[in-house]
Amino acid sequence: MNVSFGILAYNESDSIGTTLESLFQQSLFTETDSSYAIEILVVPNGCTDETAKISRVTLDKLVKQSAHANVSWQVCEVEQPGKSNAWNRYVHDFSNPAADYLFLMDADIQFLEPDTLRNMIHALETTPEAWVSTDIPVKDVALKDKKNVIERLSVSVSKDVQSRERWASICGQLYCARAAMLRKIWMPVGLPSQDGFIRMMVITAGFTSPMNCQRVVLAKPASHKFEAYINLHSLLAHEKGQVMGNRINNWIYSYLRDNCNQEQDAGSLIKRLNDENPLWLRQLIQKTIAEKGWWLLPQGYAFRRFKRLQGQPLQKIISKFPVTITAFLADLVVAVQVNQELHKTGGLGYYWGKKG
């Protein structure tokens, strides 16, 4: 079995070494298993620090020390910054054409279970209808016994396990996919939010079939941790990027629904548009904004957290109210800022999109 890891990195010199060390502590690397041929490709994109250099030094050391005898590695530097472009280059240009499975990873995560990677592969091996397997992303502050208000707010906006299973969520920090299926997908150049876009391409087969959430499976037990935003400014900036990215994605979905069919799926259409007119996404967004008018976000967005309290016991409502009202005020600020930013810039190039 051929397994490829694509680690997409943007100025991660402070974290890439720790992430690679955590990767090599996985049972996939610590146990001798001749049935796996593994490649690790780090893709620094637009980096201005020593991410590439540290990756080379660390990988050279770890591969020599690994119990697994069939591990290869390469650092593939990309001059143009942007996660979407780096994703396209890894999936379609850099990864082993013979790979059975592709892992996409961020460069600033650490694994919590030693068998996370094996279990993610196993989930696909035992679920024929699934294209992608995921794990549970855990914010580092969620592991703390005592949390301040901002940390509680950060944890509260994370989806629970049941929600991830119900909505077939994909976290771009880590997922495993059947290579043949993932290679049907192309990212629009400049796309600011990738997670939801990948999910939609998978569950609709590139807008050629009805939604099928069974194409995404949650591996168990499997999880990783990542550094959460713990100050108000960074938390708001992150939420702003997420909301903006989701809104842009919805506009793209509308365009793809109108233009995709059995003869032309979303992947082939996007590849053609990227090649013929790299500015097509910007032009689509500008056209959509002109048609929408002043307010661009869904009605009632800022009040969504209060709806979650409906039907809850009074005691639970009281206990959650301080966090809910804080989150509401944050949502209100984010909504206004996102609306302004979309009118001003179209939202492209705003957010690299590492953390959740």
Model regions: which residues?
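A conserved acidic beta->alpha catalytic loop
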Residues: L41-V57, Q80, I109-Q110
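A short, conserved alpha-helix in the catalytic core of glycosyltransferases
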Residues: M181, L191-P221
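Terminal low-complexity segments of carbohydrate-biosynthetic enzymes
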Residues: A237-G356
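Conserved donor NDP-sugar-binding/catalytic core segment of glycosyltransferases
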Residues: Q110-K147
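Conserved donor nucleotide-binding strand/loop of the catalytic core
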Residues: T58-N85
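Short beta-strand-to-loop acidic/aromatic patch adjacent to the donor-nucleotide binding site
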Residues: A98-Q110
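Active-site nucleotide-sugar/metal-binding loop of Leloir-type enzymes
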Residues: N85-Y101
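Short, acidic, metal-binding catalytic loop of nucleotide-sugar glycosyltransferases
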Residues: E21-A37, K61
